[in-house]
């Protein structure tokens, strides 16, 4: 399991089944990558870093004005981005986690100036979400549209303003 803090509530809204993630070929590719990671985490991480280095080279040649952004843990919580962000200072890393200890550690000793963390709501971790918010981190939480107003999200959640992630989730900006 690459997302050990998942809950029944968050499974309903998981990115694993959203958009392209719901297609069999995408699920199979993720499964193959997970198996490769489990067999040799160090080798897999090295290969991801090498692939990213090739992408950085291509982007710097073909799209020099664009910022390359990597969300390594979109559907997992294994922390590859945390391990390779220092090797790729020109890349902006963004990750999601349900591990409060990862947030606490980043708060004390940041993983990198090019690494941004967002804490994920699971439906069962309100206390942890409050702590992450109080520490200055964003919390990602899914909302169903209000059947009366049609609004996709409330104006506030846990006393903090809600910013819609419908257009983008570039919280580091």
Role assignments for model-derived ranges:
Residues 1-173:
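Class I S-adenosyl-L-methionine
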